[in-house]
Amino acid sequence: MSLSRTQIVNWLTRCGDIFSTESEYLTGLDREIGDADHGLNMNRGFSKVVEKLPAIADKDIGFILKNTGMTLLSSVGGASGPLFGTFFIRAAQATQARQSLTLEELYQMFRDGADGVISRGKAEPGDKTMCDVWVPVVESLRQSSEQNLSVPVALEAASSIAESAAQSTITMQARKGRASYLGERSIGHQDPGATSVMFMMQMLALAAKE
């Protein structure tokens, strides 16, 4: 079983929905350790992504993901725009001309996208950033691919891993970004970027079941 282009479009549509619904929650998280604008930025960015989907829904997956990345780069403020934009642009390079993705191809897409984020943000696991979710998600997909699991099962597992990983940032001290200025006071708060990655994985798991 593979993930279809239509399911990718549904995923991005669901991301638009979740970032609208959870905008205030994400901004609340960011208020504790950041600029108090993460939820607003993600909502604005994915609203723009969803607006553009009808005109490109018949294109290949790589085209759709690149368009998503460029839209996020141009419409999301702060550090999140470049990081999430980079993820989708790098993911697009791994999915050029594809109408569907096997689990192995999905793993490669996430691996390349996450590598782009890590390279651009210069963060490592344990820094209390979205990389604390991307890294275990990629590893989960790699293991699922090796075990020849179905795409829906693999993405459900990755979604569960993402939730646990996002929650794990609560006990971390931030070493990157504005949150790092707080030192030990950053401990006890969940990272908003990591939480956004969690929401994205939850939405992909749902889209894969459709």
Swiss-Prot record:
Activity's thermal dependence: Complexation with ADP increases the thermal unfolding temperature from 40 to 65 degrees Celsius.
GO cellular component terms attached to this protein's record: cytosol; transferase complex
PROSITE patterns given in the database record: DHAL (PS51480)
A Gene Ontology BP annotation from the UniProt entry: glycerol catabolic process
Pathway listed: Polyol metabolism; glycerol degradation
Compartments it resides in: Cytoplasm
Main location: cytoplasm
Induction: Activated by DhaR.
Catalytic activity: dihydroxyacetone + phosphoenolpyruvate = dihydroxyacetone phosphate + pyruvate
NCBIfam families per UniProt: dha_L_ycgS
Further facts: Unlike the carbohydrate-specific transporters of the PTS, the complex DhaKML has no transport activity.
Assembly behavior: Homodimer. The dihydroxyacetone kinase complex is composed of a homodimer of DhaM, a homodimer of DhaK and the subunit DhaL. DhaL also forms a complex with DhaR.
Described function: ADP-binding subunit of the dihydroxyacetone kinase, which is responsible for the phosphoenolpyruvate (PEP)-dependent phosphorylation of dihydroxyacetone. DhaL-ADP is converted to DhaL-ATP via a phosphoryl group transfer from DhaM and transmits it to dihydroxyacetone bound to DhaK. DhaL also acts as coactivator of the transcription activator DhaR by binding to the sensor domain of DhaR. In the presence of dihydroxyacetone, DhaL-ADP displaces DhaK and stimulates DhaR activity. In the absence of dihydroxyacetone, DhaL-ADP is converted by the PTS to DhaL-ATP, which does not bind to DhaR.
Name of the featured protein: PEP-dependent dihydroxyacetone kinase, ADP-binding subunit DhaL
